[in-house]
Regions:
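Acidic and generally charged, gly/proline-rich low-complexity regions
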Residues: 2-183
């Protein structure tokens, strides 16, 4: 994420890595009223009433560990009725961050490496990059919130029922069929 694209985010809270210590640092975020409308538009939901995030960040050398919880009150449009309905989300967050150079070194294969792809389900995700010595907690909040949204939200109690099949109009060839049968 570049600095210019961070300016367009509706909810941005950059945090300098130097301010994070070995002991966990608590950071609480809450979107203001003006930010909520922009967040709703950004996420493609009908409205956002509340957005709060509580994070705990700790540092181990150049790496940063982030854990926390996002709480959001939103309105999404039902895919069946198109009516807005309330949605409460509680999203757990757990991420590791590392400097960009360290991530690039991890991704660069050496000449001795074989091309052997093995996917392990219990393998941890690679760390997120620390860009220019900062971590944007607003960006983290928006990403995890977007991933937690139901892509096909359905209002509770609403069921989709297929429309009744239309009775086909009488074919022009039906008259020929009747003539052939002698009716």
């Amino acid at each position: 994420m570049t600095a210019s694209s961070q300016d367009t985010l509706p909810f941005s809270h950059p945090l300098r890595v130097e301010t994070i210590t070995l002991r966990p640092v608590a950071v609480d975020l809450a979107a203001e009223q003006g930010e909520l409308a922009a967040v709703a538009s950004f996420l493609g939901v009908a409205s956002a009433e509340a957005l709060k995030a509580s994070y705990s960040l700790s540092r181990n050398g150049e790496r940063v560990k982030l854990e926390g919880m996002i709480k959001a009150s939103l309105h999404q449009n039902c895919v069946v009725t198109v009516d807005p309905f309330p949605v409460e989300l509680n999203v757990p967050v757990k991420l590791d961050f590392a400097p960009e150079a360290e991530i690039a070194a991890m991704a660069r294969p050496s000449e001795d490496d074989e091309i052997d792809i093995e996917v392990l389900m219990n393998e941890e995700d690679p760390p997120e990059p620390i860009i220019d010595g900062t971590i944007d907690l607003g960006l983290v909040t928006l990403e995890f919130l977007a991933l937690a949204l139901d892509p096909y939200p359905r209002k509770p109690g609403v069921a989709f029922s297929e429309p009744a099949p239309e009775t086909p109009a009488e074919s022009p060839f039906a008259a020929l069929l009747q003539l052939k049968r002698g009716e």
